[in-house]
Amino acid sequence: MIKKRKVLLLTSRNISSLVVDTLCDQAEQDTAIACFYFDYASQKEQSPTNMLGSLLKQVVAGLEEIPEHIVQAFKGGKRFLGGRGLQLSQIVELLEVTLSSQRTFLCIDALDECIAAHRLKVLSSLRQILRKSADTRIFLTGRAHVRGEIESRLAGITATLFITPRKDDIYGYLRARLDEDTNPDAMDDCLEADILKKIPETVSEM
């Protein structure tokens, strides 16, 4: 069923970094990955224009050559991506065209932290993008109360999973990241043990 969907919603936000890491590790060379994290403390700044502009910037940064239509758009706006130089409709149009030529994963974390009015615009924009971009897939995370909004705005193309990570999974992820630390002496054994004990217990109970 999920294979037929273009949007995957996880109503647990605790493993979003695991999903993004897996996508980055396993993605083919011609696959683009762009991510955005909503933060409650930055709600006013994280408008639909800024959010989608950030995704566009990431996708464009991964291209070997910037398409002419994007160059011309920014010559006209003379502003940075996600800024006031481009309107939301223009950014959506640029994403439609750019994503239509390559396989892309858009990862949007903590959608529930987005202002409700902004969230509806974001979802409507994403649906518009998906209509024109057959090879684009969207990974969303958010608390359960936004599920209705998402399934309504992205009706027929959303699969929802509720996932609760196990302590062992979280411990393994933390252990792997600590082992990759390029400066292991910066953390003493007591702090490391505390991290490996408390974080898995706390997250698995959320």
Predicted feature locations:
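Conserved NB-ARC/NACHT P-loop NTPase core of NLR-like innate immune receptors
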Residues: M1-M206
